[in-house]
Amino acid sequence: MKRKILFVVTLLSTLAFMSCKKDGATPSPSTPEATETTPTTPTEVDTVALKKQIEQEKETLSKPYNEEEDAQAKLDALIAQASKEGKYVFVQAGGNWCIWCLRFNDFVQQTPELKQVVDENFVYYHLNYSKNNKNKAVFDKYTPNSKGLGYPFFFVIDGTGHVTNIISSETLEEGKGYSVAKVKEMFVANAPKK
């Protein structure tokens, strides 16, 4: 019974509020209320604006993923190089379609303390995943349990071709980008022990 009364009171209050007009005035044809527009919610407008902003940002960032590359052949060469240099292969999985992938690449390249840690410890590779080239065999071989991870995600391969770790980028995010401290800590923790 109390629910019915509460519902009726809420309904009547809502109807009364909706029927009120500011100062009792009727909107004139020149006021915004009188013009016919397609109703849009702020969320829809924000989504459209956000998509446009992301596309503009993508245009300014380098595109490190190569859809046409033979990823397994490239990884074989990088593993041999890493073994020779006493480094690991750091693989960033994603694609040029992924704003977070492009942001991470730019973040590492533009942050001297991160770039130094990477250059000293890793051979870096961008493993493409896209509609045109999903590199299914490579992902199945190195990261068979990564299906729940978002892009980018990372994995580290030692000089013998063994995957030492798979890392979600979600733990490294901060706002619209990444945390220098968290990313540096991740690189250091996954570097070869010297």
What residues fall within each predicted segment?
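Non-catalytic, surface beta->alpha helical segment in thiol-disulfide oxidoreductase systems
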Residues: 149-194
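Bacterial signal peptide processing site
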Residues: 21-23
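N-terminal leader/targeting and pre-domain segments
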Residues: 31, 38-85
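Thiol-based oxidoreductase modules, predominantly thioredoxin-like and allied folds used
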Residues: 69, 115-136
